[in-house]
Amino acid sequence: MMVCPGKPGASLLMLSMLFHIIDSYPNNEMARGGCDECRLQENKIFSKPSAPIFQCVGCCFSRAYPTPLRSKKTMLVPKNITSEATCCVAREVTRLDNMKLENHTDCHCSTCYYHKF
């Protein structure tokens, strides 16, 4: 049986490279799955050193359940599963000159408005 001296060295090199890649993987939203609790977080894109901008980010619950029969009868296109979700939104919303102004100083889980204009 012939032993090649390069094989253990190559294996150790590959193993150390793998550990280096895993260790250097960023501990950011993608690494955590993007599901922290609903809270205020600084927006790095729009913030300036003298004027930080915060926004509500995080996960709230979502669930799916069988559609009740009485509801299914009233649907134009009946579906078997109904889903319900809440989003992380600003607690206080005011209007200023007919423009919605969201004051992101406190966050909570509430109705998702991302699809509404």
Curated annotation (Swiss-Prot):
GO CC field: extracellular space; follicle-stimulating hormone complex
Principal subcellular localisation of the protein: secreted
Glycosylation sites noted in the Swiss-Prot or TrEMBL record: N80, N103
Keyword Cytoplasm: no
Secretion signal, residue range per the UniProt entry: 1-24
Record GO terms (molecular function): follicle-stimulating hormone activity
Annotated localization: Secreted
Keywords: Disulfide bond, Glycoprotein, Hormone, Secreted, Signal
Keyword presence, Secreted: yes
InterPro entries according to UniProt: Cystine-knot_cytokine, Glyco_hormone
One Pfam family it belongs to: Hormone_6
SUPFAM superfamilies listed in its UniProt record: Cystine-knot cytokines
Oligomer status and interactors: Heterodimer. Glycoprotein hormones are heterodimers composed of a common alpha chain described here and a unique beta chain which confers their biological specificity to the different hormones.
PANTHER family from the UniProt entry: GLYCOPROTEIN HORMONE ALPHA CHAIN, GLYCOPROTEIN HORMONES ALPHA CHAIN
Function description: Shared alpha chain of heterodimeric glycoprotein hormones. These hormones bind specific receptors on target cells that in turn activate downstream signaling pathways. Involved in gametogenesis and steroidogenesis.
Name listed for the protein in its UniProt record: Glycoprotein hormones alpha chain
Organism name: Anguilla anguilla
Gene of this entry: cga
